[in-house]
């Protein structure tokens, strides 16, 4: 399993089927980048200047919304993941 370092978070992208207002399903090439994902691994947290470690605010299993062009896409064990910094997370859903 991927183990993120520091304030990094590993997420699995949640793909949504995109349709136009008239019901046409858009091909992958015309879709927006997904901005929603499920947290699958969390780093140990960010280290402050005084050496204190701040625990991440998200947990494994959380559904999140993140910045549109954030993170680095990686493939591991046949699945696609995104590794991003905690600061790229905009909200936790639910």
From Swiss-Prot:
Main location: cytoplasm
Keyword field: Chaperone, Cytoplasm
A Pfam family it matches: Cpn10
Keyword Lipid biosynthesis on entry: no
GO process terms (BP): chaperone cofactor-dependent protein refolding
Entry's Gene Ontology molecular function annotations: ATP binding; metal ion binding; protein folding chaperone; protein-folding chaperone binding; unfolded protein binding
Location relative to the cell: Cytoplasm
Signal peptide: none
GO CC list: cytoplasm
Highest taxon listed in the record's lineage: Bacteria
Gene3D superfamilies for this protein: GroES chaperonin (2.30.33.40)
Subunit structure: Heptamer of 7 subunits arranged in a ring. Interacts with the chaperonin GroEL.
Function: Together with the chaperonin GroEL, plays an essential role in assisting protein folding. The GroEL-GroES system forms a nano-cage that allows encapsulation of the non-native substrate proteins and provides a physical environment optimized to promote and accelerate protein folding. GroES binds to the apical surface of the GroEL ring, thereby capping the opening of the GroEL channel.
Family label: Belongs to the GroES chaperonin family.
Protein name: Co-chaperonin GroES
Gene from which the chain derives: groES
């Amino acid at each position: 399993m991927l183990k993120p370092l520091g304030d990094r978070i590993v997420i699995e992208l949640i793909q949504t089927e995109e349709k136009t207002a008239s019901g046409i399903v858009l091909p992958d090439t015309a879709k927006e980048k997904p901005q929603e994902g499920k947290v699958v691994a969390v780093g140990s947290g960010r280290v402050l200047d005084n050496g204190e470690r701040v625990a991440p605010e998200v947990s494994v299993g959380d559904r999140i919304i993140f910045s549109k062009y954030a993170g680095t896409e990686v493939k591991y064990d046949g699945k696609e993941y995104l590794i991003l910094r905690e600061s790229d997370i905009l909200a936790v859903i639910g």
